[in-house]
């Protein structure tokens, strides 16, 4: 069996297959992170915008999205996504995989079907030489707000091995073999 070395970040959760027959490992939200800025104190991480522990005081945009959710175990903070909003979340771990293994970050079908929540960078490819925390760009396609919670299972990762072909340049289009399909593209095979 192939091994993947995994470093859990503080507050991160181990990816988990929820059934014996599952191919994908569910991954959970650790933090809301910046898509542009790295953490000034830890260059392997993106800048944390919201950690689900404290209401941020230095970012009015993020602060207006934070809501308090009453729970039996005590109030919890959540991030309220606006309709049509995308938010980048960190999933709490860093991997080391042998080349040519990689993983794809894919949506969880239940979130999409039941809640209208999907991910826009799907599948997001995480290469074996990447040594940062993978991010999931969550998209709310609903006409109403949606709450993101810490440790919410937000996506799944699917480990695979890549085929790395030798690319051979030909001098003309005629050197490529003909097919019955030819240049028929989008929708050419119909929907039935």
Feature names for model-found ranges:
Residues 1-192:
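DUTPase catalytic domain/fold
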């Amino acid at each position: 069996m192939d091994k993947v070395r995994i470093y859990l970040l503080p507050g991160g959760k181990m990816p988990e297959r929820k059934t014996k027959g599952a191919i994908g490992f569910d991954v959970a939200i650790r933090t809301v992170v910046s898509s542009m800025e790295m953490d000034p104190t830890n260059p392997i991480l993106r800048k944390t915008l919201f950690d689900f522990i404290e209401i941020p005081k230095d970012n009015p945009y993020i602060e207006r999205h934070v809501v308090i959710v009453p729970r039996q175990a005590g109030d919890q903070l959540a991030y309220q996504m606006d309709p049509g909003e995308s938010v980048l979340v960190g999933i709490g771990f860093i991997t080391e995989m042998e080349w040519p293994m990689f993983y794809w970050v894919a949506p969880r079908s239940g979130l999409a079907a039941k809640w209208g929540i999907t991910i826009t960078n799907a599948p997001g490819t995480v290469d074996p030489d990447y040594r940062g925390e993978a991010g999931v760009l969550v998209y709310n396609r609903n006409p109403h707000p949606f709450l993101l919670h810490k440790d919410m299972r937000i996506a799944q990762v699917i480990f695979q091995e890549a085929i790395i072909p030798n690319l051979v340049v030909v001098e003309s289009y005629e050197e490529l073999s003909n097919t019955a399909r030819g240049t028929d593209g989008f929708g050419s095979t119909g929907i039935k």
